[in-house]
Amino acid sequence: MRLTIVFKDEFEEHMKKQFGAFTNPQVYGVKSVHMEGGYLCSTISDTVRWRMDDISRFYCEEG
């Protein structure tokens, strides 16, 4: 499954300042996706969580 996350502009700017570069949107190959509290969680090789407050939108595609 392919997970695409489009982060909010504020988060993108913060990441660029912190790391020097940041690609938005981020695309991940994942095994599963679910919501838990205020987080979007997915299983890649381990469980990864993103704060929903940082996300503008996201979508999943099979394949």
What are these regions (language model features)?
Residues 43-63:
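Short, mixed-charge low-complexity intrinsically disordered segments
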Residues 5, 40-43:
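SH3/SH3-like beta-barrel fold
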Residues 1-13:
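A short beta-strand micro-motif
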Residues 6-8, 31, 36, 53, ...:
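A structural detector for beta-sheet-dominated domains
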Residues 13-40:
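Short, flexible N-terminal segments of the mature chain
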